[in-house]
Amino acid sequence: MKHIVFILLLVFLVSCDSPINRPPIPNTPTLKMDSIYTAADFRSYGDYYNANLQVFAIDLLSEGLAYDSTFHISGSGCNLFLSDIFTTCDSIPAGHYEMDSTAKKMTFLRGMNFEGNITGTYLLQISEDNIQHIVLFQSGSMDVKYTDQGTHLDFKLYTADSTYYHATYQGPSKYRIKSRKEK
């Protein structure tokens, strides 16, 4: 009798709809991924971690998305976000940056889902103001150049399953100063 109860309990547990039994959500997008960004919000957080490094974030929007007066995103398109870009300057200097988790100069953080909060480097696919898909990037680089046409950003990013994503931005780089509370 104990064996029957044990087997029934095991069958019950295995058949439950738990995260263990659900297939993982793929990290590669199923929707079109825009790769040319037309609007940007550059944010400066100062020496946010008290590590003698300036911390920045870049929020990029593809055509179809826009910021409202409070910098909330609306519309349909792609939003590429990079947080925790580390430099020793008061702005993001020209050069090559690598995705890293060490918080060294000329690096930026990989995408992470930390207890339900998405941070680091990620892509949101937005349709009619609703997030349809999230892509976390695990490795890659960013090249920054300044020209007569403004700031030029070139991204070579990879997901956990090695899916490649190339994106660019060319335009102004106006910085907003943010506090620790506003991150």
Predicted regions and their residues:
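Short, exposed beta-strand/loop patches in secreted or surface proteins that constitute
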Residues: 28-51, 141-148
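C-terminal motif of bacterial Sec signal peptides marking the signal peptidase cleavage site
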Residues: 12-15
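Surface-exposed helix/loop patches within compact recognition domains
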Residues: 48-144
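Sec-dependent N-terminal signal peptides
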Residues: 6-8
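Bacterial signal peptide processing site
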Residues: 17-20
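Positively charged n-region of N-terminal signal peptides that target proteins for export
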Residues: 1-4
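Edge beta-strand at a domain terminus
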Residues: 22-27, 31, 84, 138-140, ...
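Sequence-level detector for tyrosine residue identity
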Residues: 37, 45-49, 67, 97, ...
